[in-house]
């Protein structure tokens, strides 16, 4: 699975880890994140992420 990086703050979304603090389970692909999901560090939208 691909890792996506926030272009604003550098946070890496790793699908293997998910984002448990936001209720995103491990194994959730970036494409499957809810549209309203935001970077847990800086609050940037999904549009601010690029595939690593």
UniProtKB/Swiss-Prot annotation:
Q: Where in the cell is it found?
A: Cytoplasm
May I have one GO cellular component term? Answer: cytoplasm
**Sorted alphabetically, which keywords does the UniProt record give?**
Cytoplasm, Electron transport, Formylation, Iron, Metal-binding, Transport
Q: What is this protein called?
A: Rubredoxin
Residue list for modification N-formylmethionine: 1
> Family per UniProt?
Belongs to the rubredoxin family.
Domain Rubredoxin-like: residue ranges: 1-52
Q: Which PANTHER family match?
A: RUBREDOXIN, RUBREDOXIN-1-RELATED
Which Gene Ontology BP terms does the record give?
Answer: alkane catabolic process
Instruction: Identify the cofactor(s).
Output: Fe(3+)
Q: Which InterPro entries match?
A: Rubredoxin, Rubredoxin-like_dom, Rubredoxin_dom, Rubredoxin_ET, Rubredoxin_Fe_BS
């Amino acid at each position: 699975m691909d890792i996506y990086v926030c272009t604003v703050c550098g946070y890496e979304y790793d699908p293997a880890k998910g984002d448990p603090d936001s209720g995103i389970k491990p194994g959730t692909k970036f494409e499957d994140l809810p549209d309203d999901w935001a970077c847990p560090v800086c609050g940037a939208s999904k549009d601010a992420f690029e595939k690593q």
